[in-house]
UniProtKB/Swiss-Prot annotation:
Signal peptide: none
Pfam families assigned to the protein according to its UniProt record, in alphabetical order: AAA_2, ClpB_D2-small, zf-C4_ClpX
Name listed for the protein in its UniProt record: ATP-dependent Clp protease ATP-binding subunit ClpX
Residue numbers binding ATP: P118, T119, G120, S121, G122, K123, T124, L125
Biological function: ATP-dependent specificity component of the Clp protease. It directs the protease to specific substrates. Can perform chaperone functions in the absence of ClpP.
GO biological process: one example: proteolysis involved in protein catabolic process
Residues given in the record as Zn(2+) binding sites: C12, C15, C34, C37
The gene coding this protein: clpX
GO cellular component: HslUV protease complex
Similarity field: Belongs to the ClpX chaperone family.
Subunit structure: Component of the ClpX-ClpP complex. Forms a hexameric ring that, in the presence of ATP, binds to fourteen ClpP subunits assembled into a disk-like structure with a central cavity, resembling the structure of eukaryotic proteasomes.
Organism: Dechloromonas aromatica (strain RCB)
Keywords: ATP-binding, Chaperone, Metal-binding, Nucleotide-binding, Zinc
Amino acid sequence: MSKGGQEKLLYCSFCGKSQHEVKKLIAGPSVFICDECISLCNDIIRDELPEEAAKAGRSDLPTPREISSILDQYVIGQEVAKRILSVAVYNHYKRLRHTAKNAGDVELSKSNILLIGPTGSGKTLLAQTLARLLNVPFVMADATTLTEAGYVGEDVENIIQKLLQKCDYDVEKAQQGIVYIDEIDKISRKSDNPSITRDVSGEGVQQALLKLIEGTTASIPPQGGRKHPNQDFVQVDTTNILFICGGAFAGLEKVIQSRSERGGIGFGAEVKSKDDGKAVGKILLDAEPEDLIKFGLIPELIGRLPVVATLQELEESALVQILTEPKNALVKQYQKLFSMEDVELEIRPTALSAIAKKALARKTGARGLRSILEHALLDTMYELPGMESVEKVVIDENTITGDTPPLLIYADQPKVSGSN
């Protein structure tokens, strides 16, 4: 208190606000700092930490074996694809480090990746897991929505715009990100002959993607929006952005078979028999650039995707593993949901096999597992929040096939869902 009986007014030493203008004023040796200035300092430190972490992360890059073992925690099977991806990604970020240190040395070219595999085999999950592991910006684009510049639809530069938005318009960070372009097979040209008419969503998009994938400086409108004359653009160099393209390439196996079955004629010709029993995934392993050209990709685009990884169709045992083993396994997710209602969920091995068989029959791969399990548990999840004394829900093979509802076990005695 001052001599006049009035309280001495204290001020923040940084912003000058009085103690009555802020929530809290913290005293130090002859200085004061308010809660607002502390919050501002925290924001500044928080912005600088990711940059330091990214630099430290790049200097301590995990080895291909370490990358593959981390992928194993999330993606079941696909060992060959994981090995190819691990080496390609490791070499890519090692190349960035080399370029930063040795600007005038041998220039290392970029190796973008093409993933070929049936739907639900893990193409997208592999790319997402890689980005999360390396702590780099990651964006997914759908090739089917892209058109040539000047036509209705998404411009290919929108992909880079999304990447910029992902890292709050930090250009340096965006220039070392990963872009995954899905459904790349859907922009194949309609025939293997060059088209005389404009193909704005097929071959035209492939042509537009060429420079972007190889490396160019893209002009991106700030904070999104359309391009306008006399507008300032954000310049993004795509040279160090890793592009991963993925597609199911349905029908490519027929192109490969027709090539491999071609033979000479006459008595000295080699006799080749059709191997109809060979799995699609096994046939795709024999894919050559000429097959992709025949399928409808232009040679220039294939040349810019030098690393090709083929994913196999998932078998029943692999689908069962996907349901239970990964960190974010589907069964674990539903068990967590049920635990929020204080109910235990048990899915028996026979039920897991039935789910896997159903997904195989539908030809939806791992992507179809959730819809099958969701359908089996729908009525139970609808009724359960309004029910009392339910301790456990048991799912068996008959529940998946639709013959019987899930078994509800109450605190006193077991009871079947839906019975009185």
